[in-house]
């Protein structure tokens, strides 16, 4: 509505009264009048009135005019209010936390999220990668049975998906490189700043590649370039994280073994003892990345720490550790935002892996058949959008969910609840 008013005013329709609705943003009280900014989702409008209405919903009737010379206002216009009516009061927000979405910060975060997803999609289109929409209800687990949300699917056991990767692999023979932006679910009852039961998962699968061709770096850097080149999203980033700089390329590559050595040399322990090959170094690696101060590509993790579908590297003579063609991207003060790998493309190797992991191959018959009928060397990765957004905006959040009569706003941020 506000943007439409500006268009009408540009046609030189003067001395008309308009009725506008919107939400009151922070106001600036003066001696006799109060200036406030009204937002309706399409834009901002300066309003002149009296009263205490910050973050309330109001109906305003008044005359639109250009701001006086020497003064400024959003859009260069203001409305002199003749009549106003309070629709809702802000005082209820303390008890109804799902209303924290009302405000400039929440608006900026959601707008930046939309711009981020658009930038990712633009980057994939540039690289001739096609978007597909895999199912959210599945019967095959990807990451492990302990983190599955189970449900009854017309008398059969089904799950909310942990990842769309297996389905993306089935699209390669008919579409080539593919990606999806899909919700993923993890039944991990961890109440931390870095755990979400539901999150937006950007995943890609690429055919006829080797380990060096997994284009995580290109997607991250090119998407950030798109955001910073667009005036609207650049303004949002400046508002939320003024000192953000594009990530320096190339990212720092560091093997799992070298990272283990680095941790021991810098006194970062594993449960009070030094790290050894085979330990899960996830939390310690985040500390390491914070100290190094740049984006780090960790690669070649032991097979016992990674998923069944990841391609195994040739085992070195005399070593009892099998490594995978896998990688994680870690960002300082954020943590892991991307995990990727080459996939097992050999039928016999995949069957052997099922047995080693104690998995029932019959459940994955459709996935296994991809290796029997026209497979290729392929790999891919998954990126958590909420985690990625924290690196661009310091803040990221999910919409509220209702559970047992208690409303929770699910957040992913190091800064506590939005205010």
Annotated model-derived regions:
Residues 1-419:
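Class II aminoacyl-tRNA synthetase catalytic cores and aaRS-like
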């Amino acid at each position: 509505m506000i943007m439409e008013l500006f268009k009408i005013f540009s046609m030189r329709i003067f001395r008309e009264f308009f009725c506008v609705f919107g939400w009151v943003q922070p106001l600036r009280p003066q001696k006799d009048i109060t200036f406030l900014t009204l937002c309706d989702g399409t834009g901002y409008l300066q309003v002149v009135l009296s009263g205490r209405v910050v973050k309330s919903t109001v109906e305003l009737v008044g005359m639109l005019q250009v701001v006086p010379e020497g003064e400024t206002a959003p859009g260069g216009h203001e409305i002199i209010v003749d009549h106003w009516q309070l629709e809702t009061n802000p005082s209820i927000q303390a008890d109804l936390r799902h209303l924290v979405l009302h405000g400039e910060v929440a608006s900026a975060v959601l707008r930046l999220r939309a711009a981020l997803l658009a930038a990712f999609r633009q980057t994939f289109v540039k690289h001739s990668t096609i978007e597909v929409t895999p199912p959210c209800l599945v019967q095959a687990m990807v990451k492990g049975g302990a983190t599955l949300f189970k449900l009854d699917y017309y008398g059969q056991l089904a799950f909310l998906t942990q990842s769309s990767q297996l389905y993306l692999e089935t699209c390669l023979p008919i579409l080539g490189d593919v990606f999806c932006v899909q919700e993923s679910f993890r039944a991990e009852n961890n109440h931390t700043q870095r755990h979400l039961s539901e999150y937006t998962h950007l995943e890609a699968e690429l055919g006829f590649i080797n380990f060096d061709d997994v284009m995580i770096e290109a997607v991250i850097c090119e998407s950030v370039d798109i955001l910073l080149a667009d005036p609207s999203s650049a303004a949002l980033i400046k508002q939320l994280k003024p000192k953000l700089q594009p990530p320096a390329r190339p990212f720092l590559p560091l093997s799992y073994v070298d990272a283990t050595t680095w941790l021991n040399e810098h006194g970062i322990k594993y449960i009070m003892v030094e790290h050894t090959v085979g330990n899960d170094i996830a939390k310690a690696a985040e500390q390491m990345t914070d100290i190094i101060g740049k984006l780090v590509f960790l690669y070649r993790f032991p097979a016992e720490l990674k998923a069944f579908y990841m391609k195994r590297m040739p085992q070195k003579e005399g070593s009892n550790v099998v490594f995978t063609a896998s990688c994680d991207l870690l960002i300082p003060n954020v943590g892991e935002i991307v995990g990727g790998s080459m996939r097992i493309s050999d039928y016999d190797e995949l069957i052997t892996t099922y047995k080693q992991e104690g998995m029932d191959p019959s459940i994955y018959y459709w996935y296994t058949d991809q290796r029997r009928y026209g497979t290729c060397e392929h790999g891919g990765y998954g990126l958590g959008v909420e985690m990625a957004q924290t690196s661009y905006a310091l803040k990221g959040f999910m919409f509220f969910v209702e559970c047992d009569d208690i409303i929770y706003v699910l957040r992913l941020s190091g800064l506590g609840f939005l205010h």
